[in-house]
Amino acid sequence: MPHTAQIIGSGPNKVICLNGWFGHARGWGPLMHSLDTRHFSYAFMDYRGYGARKGSGGPYTIAQIAHDTLALADHLGWAHFSLIGHSMGGSAIQHVLADAPERVQALVGITPVPASGAPFDDAGWAFFASAAHDPAVRKAIIDLTTG
């Protein structure tokens, strides 16, 4: 995996931030001015197929996001770290915790999807899957989930 992440701060406390679906690492931008960069170092990672990694190969799964998160931490030399996850990223941080509990110091979930996933019927899954190729469906999902 290309280890691409935006790193902010130089503090000893390490934090990896994972965005929600349809988001990317730059989506955290409005919060940057509020971060404590003296005591914390933050890594904002793009998932496969998102942001700077758009067009990268899959798999495009929560398990792969968790794997890539641990690979990023290894690449950065972060033996221990905390995780912040929004929505789908909240599901991924739970998977990271399950995969490497000895490395995770704290979790913050912002409206997290459960680690077990969202309970959709077949029609719901088909609708969400079609968002990969249909901009109108993506817009409908964003409108539905953001009010």
Predicted ranges, named:
Residues 43-45, 86, 110:
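The conserved SAM/SAH-binding core of class I Rossmann-like methyltransferase domains
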Residues 81, 85-87:
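Conserved alpha/beta-hydrolase "nucleophile elbow" surrounding the catalytic nucleophile
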Residues 90:
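Residues forming the Rossmann-fold NAD(P)(H) cofactor-binding site
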Residues 6-55:
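Conserved HGGG/HGGXW glycine-rich cap/lid loop of the alpha/beta-hydrolase fold
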Residues 10-12, 77-80, 102:
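Active-site acidic short loop of glycosyltransferases
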Residues 54-66:
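Catalytic nucleophile-loop/oxyanion-hole region of alpha/beta-hydrolase
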Residues 94, 98, 104-134:
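Flexible "cap/lid" loop of the alpha/beta hydrolase fold
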Residues 64-81:
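Conserved acidic catalytic loop of the alpha/beta-hydrolase fold
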